[in-house]
Every structure is written in structure tokens, then in C-alpha cells.
């Protein structure tokens, strides 16, 4: 029996905390919602609210709730079947959260998002304003991807990455990724008894990504690899991220108190400004740009804009104002940014000096291909 929350250490100054609850946490590995465990999770969130912290819930479980409500129907494994279950289950899921938080006199507000809500800068800002309005009025936002209408093209993809984007929208201090694993290990603990828990991560590199693998649970869409992606995005925005076991007693309150639980990802000392956060978290890249060694050095070490002279190759089709990824000639991802020229135009000015752009195209949108204010180093 764990001690009551009131006996625990004092919580740090008021924070905004995103709690991401995966399907495996909400179902306990079964085919239906584990309501007893949801009660416990809500108790901890209510404790945080009592002490002035703002809490955002990013919840999975709509499809599981829909399947349970319809008495586990046999459906074809299609997008339409998933959307059917999500449409039925989302209303059941929000009712569960509303009922449980109501025990503590707390109100919830539902936000259903798609990729399209984040791609467009104006819609992104509207979503941010709505989220902040809920928080400022003492309402707990309960966020999920709108699976009932989301197609492959407009899906965020998983609630791990969605929670990172929501954390950026809400100006969060912490993102708690609760899963069925205690954290990130040096090997898969399910088949390697020598695997050790990684307590703290300062840099996310290829070695760490390989450790994360790519497996996912049967009911959910996110594995450890997607959690690592989410952590990388969030920490660049100045958000501390912790991956921990959702079944651990008092896990939410302990993490909020700063206890050493799970795997902690330290945020960058100098987080990205608002516009660059949107570039990192918002629109998916529409194409790729390969740059030479000189341009790579200028972008990475001097924070320079990307000039057409340094471009070696343009891949994919994108329009002016869309986001592209930037690679070096070895295929290493360096950055992403908003393009001043379309892929057609860029292909024509590859390797050209800035003063040659007008001569080649017959018009110009400035001397740079991507301005440094629109460029985010990865």
C-alpha cells in the first residue's frame, strides 16, 4: 500500500503537465477499458489540479471502448471498421473521463484533432488558443486524434506524437508518456534479462533510436520508437519528457514531484521560439533538399540561411511556403524549413548564386532558398 498523496514531497512550482495514456495503460492489456485503473489515474490528476498544476490528458482507447460497447463485433480489418469503432467509442470514452473527473468537481473539455488542424498556421493557432482557454478556466482538456474522420493523409499517426504536439500547443513543462514498460532499456526487457533501464537521456541519436526498435501493442498504434520521436520533438520545444509505466502506483504524482521514475529526457537549454516550434511540429515535409558540405556547415555552425548555391539536389514536389527536409550528401537529416521557392524553381537554381536567381527564373522571392528564421536544425 503506497502512502497517501498528501504525505508525499511537496510538488514543484505550478506547471502545465501533459499526461499521455496509451491503450495498453487504459485497458491493462485486455480488450476493454480498465475502469478501476482509470479511477486511480484520475485521482492523481485531481491531486495535481488541487495544487494548482494544469493538466492535459491525451487519451487513447476510443477503438477499444467502441469494440466493448458493441460487444466485440467481428469486423473486417479496414479503415472504415476502425472509424466505426472510434465513432462509437469516442463518445463512451469522454463520458468515462467526464464521470470520473466529476467525482472531484472537475470539468473536462474534449478536443479531437487531425493533422490538418496542425498543418495550417492559422488553424494551429486557433487550436492553441482553445487549449489555453480551457486550461485558464480550470477545465481539463481531454485530447484524442479524430479517428472517426481521419484518413491516412490527415492522421497524426499515433498519440505519442500527438501528445508532443499538444504539449507544444499548451506550452507544457512536462510530458508524461505512460505505457506498459517502465521506460527505455538498453535491450528489449521482454526477452533479454540483462536489459537495464536508461534513467536519463541528454541527446537522442541513432544508437538510441535503434534501441527503441519499432514494435507496437496489439490494440495501440505506438511503440517505443514513436515515443522516442515524440520525446525528440517535445524536448526541442523545452518540454521535459518522461517515459514510465502507467501501472506503477502513484506514477503521475511521483513524476510531477520530480522523483526518479522511468526514463527522463532533458529539454534543450534554449528551446525553439513559437514559429520554429510550429515548423518542427506542424506540417509534414513535402519534399527533400540535399545540400553540400559548405552549406551544411553554414546552417549548422553559423545559423545561416540556406542559399541556392549550396543546394545539390531537390527531391519530391513542393510549393513555395511548404516545409522540406534538408539532408547532407551522406543522407543525414540536418534540418527542416519553409521553402521560399517551389521544387520546380529550386531545381532550376541548384548551385546558382543568389544574384543569378532572377536571370534564371525571370522573377525572385528574395536571395535565399530558406531563410534562417524559417529553418529548424534537427
Curated annotation (Swiss-Prot):
- Any one Gene Ontology cellular component term annotated for this protein: cytosol
Q: Which GO terms describe its biological process?
A: L-proline biosynthetic process
E.C. code:
2.7.2.11
Q: Which reaction does it catalyse?
A: L-glutamate + ATP = L-glutamyl 5-phosphate + ADP
Which positions bind ATP? 20, 179-180, 221-227
Give the family from UniProt.
Belongs to the glutamate 5-kinase family.
The protein in question is named: Glutamate 5-kinase
What organism, scientifically named, is this protein from?
A: Photobacterium profundum (strain SS9)
Amino acid at each position: 500500500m503506497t502512502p497517501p498523496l498528501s504525505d508525499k514531497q511537496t510538488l514543484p512550482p505550478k506547471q502545465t503537465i501533459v499526461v499521455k495514456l496509451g491503450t495498453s495503460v487504459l485497458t491493462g492489456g485486455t480488450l476493454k477499458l480498465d475502469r478501476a485503473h482509470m479511477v486511480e489515474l484520475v485521482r492523481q490528476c485531481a491531486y495535481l489540479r488541487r495544487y494548482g498544476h494544469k493538466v492535459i490528458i491525451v487519451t487513447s482507447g476510443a477503438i477499444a471502448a467502441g469494440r466493448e460497447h458493441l460487444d466485440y463485433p467481428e469486423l473486417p480489418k479496414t479503415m472504415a471498421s476502425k472509424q466505426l469503432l472510434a465513432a462509437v467509442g469516442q463518445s463512451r470514452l469522454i463520458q468515462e473521463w467526464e464521470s470520473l473527473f466529476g467525482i472531484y468537481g472537475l470539468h473536462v473539455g474534449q478536443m479531437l484533432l487531425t493533422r490538418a488542424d496542425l498543418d495550417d498556421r492559422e488553424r494551429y493557432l486557433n487550436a492553441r488558443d482553445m487549449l489555453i482557454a480551457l486550461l485558464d478556466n480550470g477545465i481539463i482538456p481531454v485530447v484524442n486524434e479524430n479517428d472517426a474522420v481521419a484518413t491516412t493523409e490527415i492522421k497524426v499517426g499515433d498519440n505519442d506524437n500527438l501528445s508532443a504536439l499538444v504539449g507544444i500547443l499548451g506550452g507544457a513543462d512536462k510530458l508524461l508518456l505512460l505505457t506498459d514498460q517502465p521506460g527505455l532499456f538498453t535491450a528489449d526487457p521482454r526477452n533479454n534479462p540483462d536489459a537495464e533501464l536508461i534513467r536519463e537521456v541528454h541527446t537522442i541519436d541513432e544508437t538510441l533510436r535503434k534501441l527503441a526498435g519499432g514494435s507496437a501493442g496489439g490494440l495501440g498504434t505506438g511503440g517505443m520508437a514513436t515515443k522516442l520521436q515524440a520525446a525528440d520533438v517535445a524536448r526541442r520545444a523545452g518540454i521535459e519528457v518522461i517515459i514510465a509505466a502507467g501501472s506503477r502506483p502513484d506514477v503521475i504524482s511521483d513524476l510531477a514531484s520530480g522523483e526518479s521514475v522511468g526514463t527522463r529526457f532533458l529539454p534543450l537549454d534554449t528551446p525553439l521560439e513559437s514559429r520554429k516550434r510550429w515548423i518542427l511540429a506542424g506540417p509534414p515535409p513535402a519534399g527533400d533538399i540535399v545540400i553540400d558540405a559548405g552549406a551544411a556547415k553554414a546552417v549548422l555552425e553559423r545559423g545561416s540561411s540556406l542559399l541556392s548555391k549550396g543546394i545539390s539536389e531537390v527531391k519530391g514536389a513542393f510549393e513555395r511556403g511548404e516545409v522540406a527536409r534538408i539532408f547532407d550528401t551522406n543522407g543525414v537529416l540536418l534540418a527542416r524549413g519553409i521553402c521560399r521557392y517551389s521544387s520546380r524553381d529550386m531545381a532550376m537554381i541548384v548551385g546558382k548564386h543568389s544574384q543569378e536567381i532572377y536571370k534564371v527564373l525571370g522573377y525572385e522571392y528574395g536571395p535565399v532558398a530558406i531563410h534562417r528564421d524559417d529553418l529548424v536544425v534537427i
